[in-house]
Amino acid sequence: NVIESNAIGDVLMVQADFDPFYTLQAVTLAFGIDAKPIDIKVSGKAPGPGGAILEFENNRFANLTFIAYPSEFPEVTEITGTKGRITLEQPAHCPTSLTVRIPPITPSRYMRDNTPSPSQRFDYPLPSSVSVPRAFVNQQGFIYMIEAIHRCLAARLLECPQFNKQDSLHLMEILHGVLKYR
């Protein structure tokens, strides 16, 4: 894991756009499932467009933009650390690629000659064995979640070790903190 290995340094910022649930999943991915916001500012009324800024300890922030349908939006997630950046490419809620950028000199490429950071792209192809009629973009990528559930059921597990009940409840608590202002 690029975040856990500290390859991008300490995560300082998450920027994401889509709906509150998916953007908040990116926040818990970046800051850790146990991170709790110390302040939440929300603008906009559901189901229209809006946004939220979540502040976490140690001067860390999440800047989330909630879109309204129909509209054209980037749906890209950026996770910025002290040493580099991760981009979950479009569509970020179920991406097929991510890009890691780590400049040779930190804290910023702007400190020198403004040369773009070297990047490394990782591609995750969609399963070709799944046909989903009238599917949304990359929807067949969710097959990986379904396979994880099947593995847990076959092993007689009551919850998935990668995202357990406590993780789900924590994410729902943060989601409630955002939605109560929308």
Residue ranges, per PLM feature:
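Short helix-loop capping/hinge motifs at secondary-structure junctions, enriched
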Residues: 6-11, 156
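Rossmann-like dinucleotide-binding domain that binds NAD(P)(H)
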Residues: 9-80, 90-92, 166-170
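C-terminal helix-rich "cap/oligomerization" subdomain common to oxidoreductases
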Residues: 57, 144-182
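Short polybasic amphipathic segments
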Residues: 77-79, 94-111, 117-127
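Active-site loop of classical SDR/Rossmann-like NAD(P)-dependent oxidoreductases
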Residues: 113, 118-126, 133-147, 163
